[in-house]
Every structure is written in C-alpha cells, then in structure tokens.
Amino acid sequence: MSQPAFKIIIVGCSVTGLTLAHCLDKLGVEYTILEKRSAVVLQEGASVAVMPNGGRILDQLGLYDAFEKATVPLDLTDAYLPDQDFRFTSDYPRRVLATFGYPVAFMERRGLLEILYDGIADKSKIHLNKGVTHVEQNDDGAKVHTEDGEVYEGDIVVGADGIHSKTLREMWRMMGEPVVNGIAQSESQNMSVAFSCVFGISHDVPELQPGEQILRMCNGSTIFVMGSKGVVFWFIVTQLNRRYEYHDAPRYTTEEAAAFCEARKDAEIKEGVTFECIWRKQHVFNMLPLQESLFQTWSHGRVVCIGDSVHKMTINLGQGANCAIEDVTVLCNMLRAFLAEKREKKPSYSEIDTLLRRFNKEHLPRASTIVETSRLTTRVHAQVGISQRIMTRWVVPYFGKFLQGKPLGLIASGPVLDFLPLKRASYPGWERYRVKKSSRGAGFWITAFLSLSLLAVAATMYGWGNSQIWADWNIL
C-alpha cells in the first residue's frame, strides 16, 4: 500500500501564503490553505512595495509580468529635510533598475493578492472562513482545527497568518512557553512599537506624476508620496510618545485617523503642493501602530511560522513583503532537497523538526539584517537622534551615490528558487553587489555606517567631496 502524499497546511491566504502555494505547485507538493476571512482580496487601503529581490522570485514563478504591467517604476526621489530650503534628489530608484533589471514599484496590496490568487490553478485548495482554533501534532502528522469544527491533516503546518498569528501562539503553547500579554516570555524583548503610520491611496492627483517619489523628512515623522498609474500611494510615519509593547500599543479609529490627516493638510509636499491636494482625493486610508519584531524561534516539531508572524518591520525600507517572499524561497529550497532525499519514505516527526530548525537557523541572519536595516532607516527618515540628522543633512545629499553599495548589497544578497530558472540573471548587479556570508551582522554595518557618516562630514569640511576614494570604497 502506497504512502499518502506529503501535505502542507498553510494558515493564512496572505502574500506569504499564496507565494508558498505557487512554490509548492511547482514542486508538486500537496497543500491546503486556511483563511479566516470571508474573501482573499479585501480593500484595506494598504499598498505594497516589490523590490528586485522579491520581484525576481515572482518572475521565476511566472507572476511578475502581471505586476509589471500594473505598476510604474519609481524613477527619482526628491527628499526634503525639516529645513524647508534644503532638498536633494536621489537617483537610487533609477540605479536599482539599471543594476538589477527590476525596479522599485508599488501597487495596492489587494492588487498583488489578486495576481497571486488568479495564478493558482486549483482554487479548491483555498478554504475561506476557516479561523484556526488549535493545532496538534504527533509522530503521525499534524491536525489543524477550525472554528466551524473541521479538522485538516498534513505533515507540516506553516503559519503565514501575520503579526497576530494564531499559528505562532499555538506553537508557543505546544512548546510550553509562558505567554504574557500576547507574547511568549522568552520573546518579550523582541517586539516593540515606537511608530504609527497612516497609509492611504488617492486618485486623480494631477500635481503628482507617475513614477515620482517624494520623501519629506520631519523631526519625528516622515511623509512618503509615490505616484503610479492614476493613483498616489502615501504614508505618514510618526514617532510615538514612548516605546510600547505589543499588548498596549495604540489603536486608532477612522475618525482619529481622519483628524490626524486634517491637522496636516497644510504640510508642504513639494513646491505648490500641500498634503491637502492628496488628502481631498483620498479613496481609502487607515492608521495603525507599526510593530517592529524579530522572533528567534520560528519552529517547533511540524509547525513553522514565516513572514510577518516572526519578523515585522516599518514601511520605510519597503522590504516587508519581499522578506516574506524570501522566507518562502529558502523554506522551499530546503524542502525540495529534503523530499528528494526521502523519496517515497514518509519523513518522521524528528526529521521534519530538524529540517525546520535548520531553516530557522540558516535564514534568521538574513532576516535580522533586513529588520535592523529597516529599523535604522526609519529613524534616519524621522531624524531621531544627532547621528541620523548628520547623516541626512551632510552625508546622503553629497555622498549618497557612493554609499549605495550597502542597500544594493541587501537586494543582491537575497535567495532565489534553486529549482526554477532565473529570468533576468544577466544584469551584472546581482553578482557585483552580492554580499558574501560573514560573521559580521547588521549591527557591525550599522555602526560602520554611522562612523562613516562622521568621516564624510569631515571630508566635506576639508574638501574631499569629489575624491575618487569614496567611489572606490562603495562598501555601504
């Protein structure tokens, strides 16, 4: 009698969960998706950035063409500092496209979900209104129980259910972890909330062109505005009055969000354009606390969590969805090799536990680098601290082109699916900027970046600004 097919239960029909489904389809691995909501695509007012490291994986899966047709690449970024008379223009988005063959581009989150959902051949594998109540596992497999009394069985349970992940909390329960105020005691220092964000989408704003990006850095807040096809995506990220924990983070009503925006309608976005020009054309908006987290333990037994459930960052770096897509990529690469080795033999509980622990250990440093870089970027944009103010006023405007190696390296060092061909591998930036693995983590590079900032100020003072040495360094 043949063994039943190896099967994965995905909790969450998110960008993460649907990307995983596409990868499993390519691998020929059975799966079921459980989604607690009544629809896959809902209008929530959120947009999502797809960077080259995420875009090339979507391209491997045959999904990028639809995304590319629906978006406009960012071209130049006009950055304004609190001093209204000081601004500079960065060609970083343009350089990203030339370097990797993929642009920085935004679209509505629901639009990306539609692309991912439409690409699923067998939609009967997706089950809506399936809120998870509890998970159990043993030597024979895993069972996921839902609110309607149904039970779904598989070999691995993957939590792709976001920041408030039920799967993660079930994993903590099975580990015997004490949970205090919604977070495992051992992870309590690994999540905090220090910023809020109002994000919105406006239609028909003629003052802003497709591909135009404006970054308005203020003391304690940042305004982002990106023009696309007939719409404008915008965010206002604001530092909170203190650092909050998960359970006591502020929650905002629609009325509070509207009042927040009304109070800022006179804020200048660019010459002749105030925030009111965008706000009065808003189609949808929302206000949320921005959690920042990097949990250390992602798996236990047959259960593994990925995406926002284990690492969450602010929107400033634009890597949230891309980091989740990378999680899927690394997990599926390891799963492919694992199942090929097992052939027809059913993997044991211990073997699966070892596989998922190895995934956690090997991918955690990459996720940590992205989360820490995002954390620094957010504070630089909001002018939090003297070092950050020095960086934005004296370093980036004059030396930004020479310091782009680090963010380009962050993109180039992302993983790819090792069982599908690359579509735009010929672009030289992937190899040129790829960072070799080393013991130097994000903390080292952040310290180096701040140190170089001070050195660059000295260089400006002493007239070194045009020296070729800065171009040759290209380390940050």
Swiss-Prot record:
- Annotated signal sequence is 1-21
Give residues annotated as binding FAD.
E35, A49, R109, D308, A321
Annotated pathway: Secondary metabolite biosynthesis; terpenoid biosynthesis
Output the Pfam families linked to this UniProt entry: FAD_binding_3 (PF01494)
Instruction: Offer one example of a GO biological process linked to this entry.
Output: terpenoid biosynthetic process
Key words of the record: FAD, Flavoprotein, Glycoprotein, Membrane, Monooxygenase, Oxidoreductase, Signal, Transmembrane, Transmembrane helix
Name the residues that span the membrane: 441-461
This chain is glycosylated at: N190, N219
One GO cellular component assignment for this chain's record is: membrane
The record's GO molecular-function terms, alphabetically, read: FAD binding; monooxygenase activity
Q: Where in the cell is it found?
A: Membrane
Which cofactors must be present for this protein to function? FAD
Q: How is it used?
A: Diterpenoid pyrones display various biological activities and subglutinol A shows insecticidal and anti-HIV activities.
Q: How does it sit in the membrane?
A: Single-pass membrane protein
Q: What is its EC number?
A: 1.-.-.-
Specify the domain of life of the species encoding this protein. Answer: Eukaryota
Stored PANTHER family: FAD-BINDING DOMAIN-CONTAINING PROTEIN-RELATED (PTHR47356:SF2), FAD-DEPENDENT MONOOXYGENASE ASQG-RELATED (PTHR47356)
Question: Which family does this protein fall into?
Answer: Belongs to the paxM FAD-dependent monooxygenase family.
Give the protein's recorded name.
Answer: FAD-dependent monooxygenase dpasE
Gene name, per UniProt, is: dpasE
